[in-house]
Curated annotation (Swiss-Prot):
Expressed by the venom gland. One of its GO terms (cellular component) is extracellular region. This is Purotoxin-1. Keywords: Calcium channel impairing toxin, Disulfide bond, Ion channel impairing toxin, Knottin, Neurotoxin, Secreted, Toxin. It comes from Alopecosa marikovskyi. It is found in: Secreted. The keyword Thylakoid does not apply. The keyword Oxidoreductase does not apply. Negative results: does not affect mouse P2RX2 or P2RX2/P2RX3 receptors. The presence of a 'disulfide through disulfide knot' structurally defines this protein as a knottin. Disulfide bonds join C3-C16, C10-C21, C15-C32, C23-C30.
Length: 35
């Protein structure tokens, strides 16, 4: 399956291995970051 790389939005797709979906304080603009 497809996964989001680092810095890619993860609103509708999950992040690749070793990455975690993080959002800003408002809970928007979720992007994948290193764990």
């Amino acid at each position: 399956g497809y996964c989001a790389e680092k810095g890619i939005r993860c609103d509708d797709i999950h992040c690749c291995t070793g990455l975690k979906c993080k959002c800003n304080a408002s809970g928007y603009n979720c992007v994948c970051r290193k764990k």
